[in-house]
Amino acid sequence: MNTGNSSIMRFFHLKLNIFLILSFLIFGFLFWHFAKEMLIVEKDGLYVGQVNLYGDLVLHLSFINKFLESGKILPDSPIFAQSKINYPIFADFTTAQIAKLTSVDFALFITTFLTGLLVIYVARIFILNFIKREKVVFLTLLIFFLNGGFGFIYFFQDYANSQKSITDFLFSMPNEYTDIKEKGYWWINSFLAYFLPQRGFLFAFPITLTILALLYTGFKKNKSYLIIIAGLLSGVLPLVHAHSLFLIFLVSLIYFPLSVMFSKEPERKNIIISWAIFAALTALLSIPIIKTISQDTNPLHFIRLDPGWTSKENIILFWGKNLGIFAPILTVALVWVYKNNKKLFSLYLPFAAIFIISNIFVFQPWEFDNSKLLIYWYFASSIIVAYFMYEFFFSEGLVHKTLGVVLIFFMVFASFLDIFRTFTPVTSYQIFSKEDIAIANSVKFLTNKNGTFVTAPIQNHPIPALSGRSTLVGYHGWLWTHGIDYTNRAQDVKKIYAGENFENLISKYRISYVTVGPHETNDFTINQKNLANYPRIILSQNWSLYDVSNIWANGNGQN
């Protein structure tokens, strides 16, 4: 009898953990798939397997190669020479250390894949703190990783207009269906918009969830050491992801008065002291780090009123189509959770507030970057929706289960299409040619690694991205989103190429090399007669450098 019961218990335990296996199998496989597409080395150049990597990965390559070539923990910015790096360095610094022993493409792969597994693991532990069901964990991850709205409608339109068979069309889809900005779809799949291109977020997400879990458990069980660990982790977040630190700040700012207000009198003093310890540790660590890596820019300068996030239409319509049926289900789920689990509802309130705040104010130059806060709101909301779906649909009879499957299908269908598309040839994008790689290698061999270059400010310029050298003014879009005022330098670069006030500007910025290649020829009017007065380094038929360091180095030029 006991043996029989033991066998039955083992069977149900195994059945329960199928969802644990599925969580790591499915989402771990997706992280592996995307990790191997981060940087693809082909005979004719370097490729990426996803369009959002086209711009973002080039920026990360600039930082990674700067760490590799400079040998410094805190080099100057590769895209704004002689200035602080002005960017969270942890992800790219870590990748660079692995690349020293292997290669950049492998380092990108292994850090993405292993950190992706950590994301799954930490997210699972976080969810189980509040809802101890593996099925809810799996549903949460499914909804979160495959977020999407009603963009799939355009899939059917595109298919109808394609005159192709369904198989041919699936393997040549012309568009993404969570990212259709011209039609107001901005809530992009979380893999494609966050975990892949935003490497800082990839590393910060599990750290942030750990901090929140430590705070929750620390206050719940009155464990001061957990609060201290949370404070230490929060304090180093500026090295990883600035918006995640801001998220912690907002959650704490909202939850602190709530925790004090609803605590009993004997506990109130300890709660206030614990929050003070957490805040003090965070500030003591984070403020010096921010001052060390960031330029002297006041972040409050960027905060502005901008209702509706990126919407150019009615905000309810905007979020309705971007979230799809997730929106009404979340509304119903919140009412249900309020009635059935008030504690969970109260824990959700700070994230609801963050959603509201992020739809009223913009906190950085580019409004889209509010999504770095909204993605945490969506994760919390996914837990609420998954919990409701499990209790209301998947714990009931066949009819309820079937309806639940249908609802989940429409929740994730747009993202499923976008992810499926990444397995097809249409999502291969070349970021650097074979010549670009050769140019970068020549620059490494022929120039001083500490020299400042003048280049065209394009996204995929091989010198700042691949050679580990710094350009006076890099891609304007990156500088703008980082809050850097580049306008004066940009004007000076034009003057340098035109030969205006040439020697004074070269001396002012201590420029070592002026680059003349296809990008510079396209972007500037170049005074070749002026440049002919300086030593020329021929990199290829189309590329040259002019060593101008003697102008300011008193004859001790850097070559």
How would you name each of these model-derived features?
Residues R10-I18, T217-L226, M261-A276, V332-A352, ...:
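Membrane-interface helix-loop-helix junctions at transmembrane boundaries of multi-pass membrane enzymes
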Residues K15, F19-I26, L139-I143, L232, ...:
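Hydrophobic alpha-helical membrane-interfacial segments at the cytosolic entry of transmembrane helices
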Residues I26-I207, A242-H243, Q430, P457:
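Active-site lumenal/periplasmic loops and adjacent helix-entry segments of GT-C-fold
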Residues G55-D56, H60-F63, L68-E69, P257, ...:
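Transmembrane-lumen/periplasm boundary regions of multi-pass, lipid-linked membrane glycan transferases
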Residues F113-G116, F201, F246-F249, W366-F392:
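Hydrophobic/aromatic-rich transmembrane helices and adjacent perimembrane loops
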Residues L192-F195, L226-H241:
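Membrane-interface alpha helices of multi-pass inner-membrane proteins
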Residues T210-G218, L250-F262, L323-F345, F388-E391:
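Hydrophobic, aromatic-rich transmembrane alpha-helices
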Residues F393-N559:
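Extracytoplasmic
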